[in-house]
Every structure is written in C-alpha cells, then in structure tokens.
Amino acid sequence: MKISISNKNVYVVSDIHNDADGFKKLLKEIAFTDDDILIIDGDIFDRGDKPIELYFEILKHPNIYVIQGNHDVWVKREIKEKFGNQKVGEYISYNTVSIMEKRLTPVDMLNIADWINQKPYYIELVLDDKLFHIAHAQVYVTTENVLDKQKIYMGDAHYDDFINGKNETYEGIAIVGHTATEDRKIWKSTSGRTIRIDCGNGYKCYNSRGFLAAIRLNDMKEFYV
C-alpha cells in the first residue's frame, strides 16, 4: 500500500497485543486528533485480555491505518477455521479468539477476520518528501513484489542482519516491530535508516518489563506509556 501525506503529524506504533487501556493512554500521550495519522504496525492481537475493547477503539478513528502482523494473521486464520470452516493456513492459537467468542456472535467473529484480511502487509509512505517503509517485521527494496507475505510479517533468513541495520539496501527509512528491543526503548541503526519500535508491551501481561511506544515521523519524537 502506498500513501502520500503532507502537513499532518504521522505516528507509528506496533505490537499493542490486546492492551486497550495502554492504547487509549498512548492516544492521550500523543494528543491524537482527527487531523493526525496513526499507523499500527502489526500485532494488535494476542497476549493481553482486552481484544474486543481494542478493536472497537481502533474502529472509532478513520485516521488510523492498520498493517497485518503475524499475530493478526494467526487470529484471522483461527477465526476462519473455527467459524467459517475454511482452512487458510497454519496458526498459533493464543487467547484472543477464546476471549472474543464468549461475547461475539460467529458473524461478528468472521467480520473481524475479514477486517484483518483487508489490511495491507506494508505501507510505503511519502511524508513531506521523506520516504518510509513500514512493515511488521522486515522490508525489501520492492516490498510490494514479495510473493511470500510471511517474509514481511515474520522475517526471512536474513532477518537478524536486517534488525541490526546490516541490510539497508532499500531507499528511505524502515520502521518495524515484531521483535522487542533489548532495552525496551525505540532502537535506531547507526545510519538511522532502520528503526525498531516494539518495546515489549506484549510481555507486560506476563509481569515482564515493557512499554507501548510510538514515534512521530515528522520529527522522530518518541512516546512511551
């Protein structure tokens, strides 16, 4: 997906992991308005205990873009298999579907799967003449031509080199989540062209240290809750 934006603040957050309360706090922290843009860089779902509340909070904001992460793909596949009798791929089952099915109808569940399925695997963003590649795990010189989408939301054999800033063959700046940073702060490569924004929020439900982090692409200001 390619978009061009000018004269708007653009924020990116990833790996929310069912943390509806943390997400609402983050929106307040960045003073999010209808004139801003927020991109969720994958992994809305799993681990935390409020997937429904998070889903409906996201739906309130037409100026939020969503990218599919591996946990979102797995939730989509599990729903389609359990409620649509469709085997559409392998998945790892966490807690999201079991929480949702207690409160939502099968039709509602399938609507969520369809909503996830409509989301892109990456966004190529031009913001005031600056180029950004935003994907859950890994970007490529021509991400749109990658046939195996799992490489985008899970990474490939060169993933470790990529997240350490050793494979910056693309133009512009890459923004990714997926793997939590070691110090739970937003990480930037020496060149500044690879930026990792998963700061371990998904592990807080296991009583582990982590933050929900966002970066404002206009000036690279960081926000944490």
Feature-to-residue mapping (PLM):
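Beta-strand-turn-beta hairpins that frame and shape the catalytic cleft
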Residues: K2-Y11, E124-H133
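Catalytic phosphate/metal-binding cores of nucleic-acid and nucleotide-processing enzymes, i.e., regions
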Residues: S4, V13, K24, A31-F32, ...
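Core catalytic region of metal-dependent phosphoesterases/phosphodiesterases
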Residues: N9, V13, N18-K87
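Active-site neighborhood of phospho(di)ester-bond hydrolases with catalytic His/Asp-centered motifs
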Residues: V13-S14, L38-G42, V66-N70, A135, ...
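Active-site environment of divalent metal-dependent phosphoester hydrolases
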Residues: H17-D21, D46-D49, D72-K76, V141-T142, ...
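Short, conserved loop/helix-junction motifs that constitute active-site signature segments
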Residues: F32-T33, I58-H61, G165-T169, W187-S191
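Active-site neighborhood of divalent metal-dependent phosphoester bond hydrolases
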Residues: P51-Y55, K60-E124, D129-K130, D161-F162
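Binuclear metal-dependent phosphoesterase catalytic core
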Residues: T190, T194-V225
